[in-house]
Amino acid sequence: MEYRSLTLDDFLSRFQLLRPQINRETLNHRQAAVLIPIVRRPQPGLLLTQRSIHLRKHAGQVAFPGGAVDDTDTSVIAAALREAEEEVAIPPSAVEVIGVLPPVDSVTGYQVTPVVGIIPPDLPYRASEDEVSAVFEMPLAQALHLGRYHPLDIYRRGDSHRVWLSWYEQYFVWGMTAGIIRELALQIGVKP
């Protein structure tokens, strides 16, 4: 199923009907979480960030708000909400969490849990100067169009890893972020 137009109700009903299967073995044991913020509009948006070029890891990359689970977090969901507040000033109380996607093993040694949440359209995003250089919204229907993602096989430490690449306006979306978006599309029944 391809989406030229996707309403929030369509997205929510498909996400709720096709619950993710979470029971898979992971390679990494350090926990992290990202928030997949879906902006509540008749034609919903997907909120993304561009990481600061001054960061040691993933500098300048497009990403979801998120990071490592710390000792104060009660769950991976709490970690995703805390990180979203720290990075782009999304109050945890403004997020309607609708579920999680299966965890993803990162090349940096984390098991990353994507948390899907609905946010209001009128939030005043404020990028953390230390971590985020830009905050932008991509139409969800465009983000979930699988034809926009192109595979690239990378060989690292003797193993082959497939990563996905795409552009949105001036933003290069690739790696784990593109993979998570593709997983979300597949989860709601978009066919490759």
Swiss-Prot record:
Which one of the record's GO molecular function terms can you name? coenzyme A diphosphatase activity
UniProt-listed GO biological process terms:
nucleoside diphosphate metabolic process
InterPro entries referenced in this protein's UniProt entry, alphabetically: CoAse, NUDIX_hydrolase-like_dom_sf, NUDIX_hydrolase_dom, NUDIX_hydrolase_NudL_CS, Nudix_NudL
Q: Which domain of life is it from?
A: Bacteria
Domain Nudix hydrolase positions: 29-160
Protein's UniProt keywords contain Magnesium: yes
Q: Which cofactor does it need?
A: Mn(2+); Mg(2+)
- Its EC number(s): 3.6.1.-
Q: What are the alphabetically sorted keywords of the record?
A: Hydrolase, Magnesium, Manganese, Metal-binding
Q: Which PROSITE patterns match?
A: NUDIX, NUDIX_COA
Residue ranges for motif Nudix box? Answer: 67-89
Detail which positions bind Mg(2+): E83, E87
Please give one Pfam family short name. NUDIX
Which family is this protein grouped under? Belongs to the Nudix hydrolase family. PCD1 subfamily.
PANTHER family associated with the record: MITOCHONDRIAL COENZYME A DIPHOSPHATASE NUDT8, NUDIX HYDROLASE
Annotated function: Probably mediates the hydrolysis of some nucleoside diphosphate derivatives.
NCBIfam families in the record: PRK10707.1
Write down what this protein is called: Uncharacterized Nudix hydrolase NudL
What organism is the protein native to? Escherichia coli O6:H1 (strain CFT073 / ATCC 700928 / UPEC)
What lineage is this protein's organism placed in? Bacteria, Pseudomonadati, Pseudomonadota, Gammaproteobacteria, Enterobacterales
